């Protein structure tokens, strides 16, 4: 089972021991989107959707999701998140979501950034489903990461 750090020699799952890794400043940015109908977009740009402030709810949910990443993703290390931002931009076809997570720790924050985007998108669908049950989540991906032994990476 070589090549998979989360599997031991017998193929059993394990949490990677990061004790000896150096603490470094690490960041990660992820993106995703929710495609919505023109009617729903007009409501988001205007009076809002019936359930409330969808953008604010999605932003907060994304931040909260990042903080809960190790509870959701098996074998993901709990790390001290030092900052999470979630930006939502309403465009002509839906809502673009960008999340950036930051820490100084022994392992990266890629999963936290991806979880923030995922939960923000899920919340946007929940907040808008009464107006647009066809809301579609897509394109969730890591865009950049910095820090750690492997150094910076950009899509």
Named regions from a protein language model:
Residues 1-55, 60-77, 81-155:
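C-terminal binding/interaction regions
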